[in-house]
């Protein structure tokens, strides 16, 4: 399937899962072991505000094609924005999810790992 023809909400749906898996793998590898601690810490990564902040770190290193997929996601017309997120953060987070969905579907696992590290782990290392 041509990625340009794949629905943007479908890419966001997949990207949400990809990001969640990256976060879960990182947290388990970091030594957290109870589901309560894992779930609480995961929220620090997957909240719309956290994803919007993470995207600021990614913009300088995105390719043109990656930027295009991000914009595609950011520009989805949202009708339901969670009450704990701003419209801007939610749109940016959706763009990030579409970006990671695109990378997953196109088989770019190393790029997913690279961007995840740059977005969330750069300051921690």
What are these regions (language model features)?
Residues 1-125:
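Double-stranded RNA-binding/processing signature
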